[in-house]
């Protein structure tokens, strides 16, 4: 693939320790005659192979299905990954961010953000919390107190 060739060249010429894709659904595999779900599956597998071949982590940001917006409980789950179950299958880790304050400004802790490790092939799953600092567009350590 084009991205694989560019990454290999960069690793050889300058070094490459990490690749971040922002975001997966904007990529094209160049495959014709296939549906979008098949294309995203191919892209996901290609990124997994590239990560293994180059020996580096590849982080791919992905959209969620719109069905999340229609549910009462908005916290994402693995089946919410958009356009492909292969993203979940190929990934070594799947991490979601969830902030109740995004959906409900009247919640008790609108800046409390959950980092949810939903899949970790070589470790434990679980959650941690950060504080969203919207005016700076960044996260900070969660103080455990209301903000």
Predicted features by range, described:
Residues 23:
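Walker B catalytic acidic pair
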Residues 1-19, 28, 33, 42-55, ...:
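C-terminal regions of RecA-like/P-loop NTPase motor modules
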Residues 61-63:
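Conserved H-loop
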Residues 38-40:
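VWA/integrin I-like adhesion module and closely mimicked acidic/polar interface patches used
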């Amino acid at each position: 693939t084009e991205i694989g060739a560019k990454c290999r060249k960069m690793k050889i010429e300058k070094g490459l320790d990490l690749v971040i894709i922002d975001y997966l659904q904007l990529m094209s595999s160049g495959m014709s005659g296939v549906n979008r779900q098949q294309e995203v599956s191919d892209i996901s597998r290609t990124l997994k192979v590239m990560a293994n071949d180059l020996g580096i982590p590849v982080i791919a940001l992905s959209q969620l299905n719109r069905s999340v917006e229609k549910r009462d409980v908005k916290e994402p789950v693995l089946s919410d990954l958009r356009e492909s179950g292969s993203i979940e299958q190929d990934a070594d880790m799947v991490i979601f961010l969830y902030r109740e304050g995004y959906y409900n400004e009247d919640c008790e802790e609108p800046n409390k953000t959950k980092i949810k490790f939903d899949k970790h092939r070589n470790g434990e799953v679980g959650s941690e919390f950060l504080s969203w600092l919207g005016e700076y567009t960044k996260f900070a350590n969660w103080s455990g107190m209301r903000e």
